[in-house]
Amino acid sequence: MKSDVKLFCLVGLPASGKSTYAKELSEQYNAKIHSSDALREELFGDVNAVSKENNDILFTELYKRVKKDLRNGNNVVYDATNVNKRNRLAFLKFISGVECEKICVLVALPYHLCLTRNLQREKSVPADVIERMYKHFQPPNEKEGWDSFSIYVNCEESDIFAYSTSVLFNNASGIDYFHQESQHHRDTLGLHSRKVADLMYEAKKELEYTALIHDVGKIFTKTRTNSHGVEDGDCHYYGHNCVGAYESLFYFLNDTDYEADAIIYHMNLIYYHMVPYNDGWNDTESKIRRLKAQLGEELYEDVVLLNRCDREAHEE
């Protein structure tokens, strides 16, 4: 039996408009707002008072307040960035004994607009903090424990008009001209992406579009230094799956008619597509079972399929 008590957990980058939307939800559902920014200012006197010690104190108290209100039968809006999977799981575990409908709300605003709007705020966040969250973004998924998903698009249609494969490929600065400069990739990013999409069309055509944009994060993560900070003659794309998952959100919104659940599913497919490149990822049955439990059977199979198409495209 579904509980009448609703929990709205917002997920979004700083300056994406979470707090504004939290107020709308609060009015619509007569919900209590619990904001990490507001509590940080209450406890430490500064929204930018960020440290591990402060965060431990902050989120322990925040979780307690959310849980108390839910137990008292109040609808709650939990307003924090929540872009990290581990933090979302810790929160859900903390409130696991409370009956409520858990709704995960992805607040969508392109990264460059987050940076612009951040500068217009009275209390801004350091730009490097937003960049770090963007480059480590982890999309939520059903197996975390959510009952439903929704997406709140906090911009005009014109703001995401350029998020289309017709623009991504077919202009002078598009990915057809993006040279990957890596020993692992001799093709341009555009050609490689088309090859993966063609292979996916033959294997599972409903994933063709996702295959076409699976590496879109590489545009924003290209670096000539390796993980040790040394130039080694190759370009590297650390975290391109995280950035790609975030950027893909706007391509799906603009180019497809997918509902929120489907968009988030495909974002996860892009986020996880690199897992099978990790050494030993499937060398024991227990590792495979853990990953299937984390993703679900269907997403697991689709991740393996996308990775297979990605590998085969390298070999063509």
Go through each PLM region and give its residues.
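Acidic/His-rich, divalent-metal-binding segments that scaffold phosphate/diphosphate chemistry
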Residues: 152-233
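Divalent metal-dependent catalytic cores for phosphoryl transfer on phosphate-bearing substrates
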Residues: 196-314
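Glycine-rich phosphate-binding loop used to anchor ATP phosphates in small-molecule kinases
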Residues: 54-102
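The conserved Walker
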Residues: 13-14
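Conserved substrate/cofactor phosphate-moiety recognition/catalytic segment
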Residues: 20-74
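Hydrophobic anchor at the beta1->P-loop junction of P-loop NTPases
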Residues: 10
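Conserved glycine(s) of the Walker
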Residues: 17
